[in-house]
Structure formats: C-alpha cells, structure tokens
Amino acid sequence: MTHTPVLLKEMLSLLSPQDGGIYVDATFGAGGYSKAILESADCKVYAIDRDETVTKFYDDLSVRYPDRIKLFIEKFSNIKSILSSVEPSPVIPVLDTGKNNWSRAGMTSNGVDGVVFDIGVSSMQLDNGDRGFSFLHDGPLDMSMDNSSYINASTFVNALREEEIANTIYNYGGERHSRKIARAIINARKKKTIKTTFELADIVRSVVFRGKSKIDPATRTFQAIRIWVNDELEELEKGIKAASEILSENGKLIVVTFHSLEDRIVKTFFKDLCATDCKTFSLLNKKVIEASIEEVSANPRSRSAKLRAIQRLS
C-alpha cells in the first residue's frame, strides 16, 4: 500500500510555509509532509523519525532538495537536543532561566517556524509482515517502531502478568473483553511461546466473536500492544510540549492523530496552554479538523484522523 499523507491540504493551509522558513516534520515516515512543505516554499525542513527504514524516502528527497532537508533517526521527544546539535543550529540553548530558554541562532526571533506531527503507525509499517504490526500479515511479534527495541510485542504477551495484560488492552485499546483476552493469552503461552501475529490474532478471536461488526476482534488488542511497546502516549506528551517551547513568534504547531487517547492528550495540552498563556499561544482551529468525505473515500485511513493546531503569538 502506498502511504498517502492524511489531511495534507489542511496541514499546508494552516502551516503556510514561507521562503527562508525553518520547519520540523517530527514524524517523517514516507516523507509526504516534508515533500509538500519543501514544494511550497524555498525553506528548510528538519525531519525526525525513530524508524531507520525511512532513510530510503529521505534519500530521494535529499537528492531533489539538496541542502534543504536533513533527517534524524531519533524519537521526536528529543526535538530540542536534535535541533541544538545542528550546525548552524536553528535553536540553541541559552543561559537564562526564563520560560523560553531557546533562541534561533543569528536571528532576532526565537525557535522554528513550524512543527508538524502525524501520529501513529504508518502504512509501510503495517504492510510489512516482518515488523509484526498487523494481524493481516503473518510475522514475528515485534511492533517496535525503532525496529531494534529489546521490548516488543512478544515481551508483552509472553512475559507480563495477566492483570497487566488485561489493564493495558482495556486502557489503550478500549477493549471491553480485555480480561477474557488476557486469560486466553496466559492459557496459550502455558502450552508454548506465542511467536507470531497470526497466533496472537487467533487467540483473541477464540474468545471475542466478530458478530455483525466490521472490525476484526483482534484490532483493539493489537492497537493496545503497539501503544504499550512504543510508549506512544508518553512520547506524544513529551514531544508536543517540547515542540511548543521551540516555536518562533507566529510559529505553528500542527498535530494529526488517529486515536481518541492521542487526540485527548493534544486537545487538553493545547487548551491548557492557550488558557494559561493566552498572550503567548492561540488555537488556530477551535473546532477539530477532520477528513472530508472525498478524502475518506480515497484513503480510508483518514476516517479517524483529527487535526489540531496552535500558534505562538509572541
């Protein structure tokens, strides 16, 4: 499956890239957002992704836009240290202990002009059976986005206690059958180690029946395990907070989410930030932006997408 950037037009309209601007694509993936930003203005993009397999997409863009894009294989929560390591750095730490202790090198304004996030698993990760993200492809139980973590989906199903499994599936997946699923996993692993995505999906389906639902019974369990493996919610909290602290005056922070837990984190953070610091930050869209009927028809993945954005005023 080709990865199609979700809410691309809406993101670009809000970001409004300018010549000479500095932007951060915090979730590079297949490079859809980065490419669109680079095409829109004579600007620079610093791209971040924890998955080293994205380098093939970066290589294409770096040839097309030499000296205008640079990729960092890192967690986006490290955005401050990443940008401070660049020569010349768009943001550098300074000694004052004020609210904003990051400044743009050689310029009067502070920080970067925009940061964009497209949260969650990508199509290329889902479609690669060896990564273990999807029950549609048989593969090892991995699900780690950096493809090298010692904690993976196998750790979750084969090492955690029953209560931990049940609570995680319920809290991160919203699965009301979480206790039955946890018990089934424990019973299965007593007989043999659970090794593949198909094995796990079959275990879930053995106790949760599809009925008339269009959603596979294993969907919520796989989602919950993926979130747990990659510590996605805490990473999101750290990432958007750090991003908000390096915005320039009039800089924009745009976040696209695909899960209610993610959206709640972003909504709450933006609302609180703008309420407590209304002279510094403002909501760009008071009502969440969702994909159009046309986009959902062309790209079903966009059905659950929600876009929220803020702007730094001073």
From Swiss-Prot:
Primary site of residence: cytoplasm
GO molecular function terms attached to this record: rRNA (cytosine-N4-)-methyltransferase activity
The keyword Membrane is assigned to this record: no
Catalytic class of the enzyme: transferase
Keywords: Cytoplasm, Methyltransferase, rRNA processing, S-adenosyl-L-methionine, Transferase
Localization of this protein: Cytoplasm
Binding site for S-adenosyl-L-methionine: G31, G32, Y33, D49, F76, D118, Q125
GO process terms (BP): rRNA base methylation
EC numbers: 2.1.1.199
Tagged with keyword S-adenosyl-L-methionine: yes
Signal sequence, start to end: none
Pfam families: Methyltransf_5
Catalytic activity reported: cytidine(1402) in 16S rRNA + S-adenosyl-L-methionine = N(4)-methylcytidine(1402) in 16S rRNA + S-adenosyl-L-homocysteine + H(+)
Listed GO CC annotations: cytoplasm
Entry function: Specifically methylates the N4 position of cytidine in position 1402 (C1402) of 16S rRNA.
NCBIfam families from the UniProt entry: 16S rRNA (cytosine(1402)-N(4))-methyltransferase RsmH
Family, similarity comment: Belongs to the methyltransferase superfamily. RsmH family.
The protein, known as: Ribosomal RNA small subunit methyltransferase H
Organism of this sequence: Wolbachia pipientis wMel
Gene this chain is encoded by: rsmH
